[in-house]
Design a protein with these regions (language model features):
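Extended beta-strand/beta-hairpin segments
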Residues: 1-55, 66-154
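Alpha-helical metal-binding/catalytic segments enriched in His/Glu/Asp
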Residues: 60-61
Length: 154
C-alpha cells in the first residue's frame, strides 16, 4: 500500500465487522465492540464510537505524559484525567424532524491531575513536551479546539 520505511512512518491496521447490532472492532491482539456513534442513554452499558474516541484521546495523552516523565526520570505518584467533548447538533443523529445540521464535535476540554514533587517550572515544561510527543493530541488539535489543563497536586 505505502512504500515508506518504518523509521519514517508506521502503518497501524485495524478491521471492523458488523454482526447483528454489534460492530466488532479488531485490534492486533484483541477486539472491542460498539453499538452506535453516540449513546445518549447514561444507563446503557453498550459502548459507542464517541465513548471509545473520548477515552482514546484521554488515554493517549495520559500515556504520553507517563512515558515522557519516565524518560526524564521524573516520578508520577498518581495521575487522573477527565475529558469533556461538546457534541453539536446531536438531534440530527436521533432523526428529529427539522434538525439536519451536521453533527460534529465543536471542541473539548481535558483536565489532568498529576501528583509529583516537581517544581512548577519543570512540571509545566514536562507536560508541554509530553503533548508535543503525543500522536493523538497533535492530530486532534487539527480537527477541533482541545483545551488541556494540567494541575499538579501534592
Amino acid at each position: 500500500m505505502y512504500n515508506v520505511p518504518e523509521s519514517e512512518c508506521f502503518m497501524a491496521k485495524y478491521r471492523a465487522v458488523l454482526r447483528g447490532e454489534e460492530i466488532k472492532l479488531f485490534t492486533p491482539n484483541d477486539s472491542i465492540s460498539l453499538y452506535s456513534q453516540v449513546n445518549f442513554d447514561n444507563q446503557s452499558l453498550q459502548k459507542s464510537a464517541v465513548d471509545y474516541f473520548a477515552v482514546s484521546i484521554l488515554g493517549g495523552i495520559l500515556s504520553s505524559v507517563k512515558a515522557h516523565f519516565a524518560q526524564q526520570r521524573a516520578d508520577i505518584v498518581e495521575m487522573e484525567g477527565k475529558i469533556w467533548l461538546n457534541l453539536a447538533n446531536p438531534l440530527t443523529l436521533l432523526g428529529v424532524r427539522g434538525y439536519s445540521e451536521q453533527p460534529v464535535i465543536n471542541d473539548g476540554k481535558i483536565k489532568i491531575f498529576i501528583s509529583s514533587d516537581l517544581t512548577d517550572d519543570i512540571f509545566t515544561q514536562l507536560t508541554q513536551n509530553a503533548l508535543r510527543c503525543c500522536f493523538i493530541y497533535n492530530t486532534i488539535i487539527k480537527a477541533f479546539p482541545l483545551n488541556i489543563e494540567f494541575e499538579q497536586v501534592l
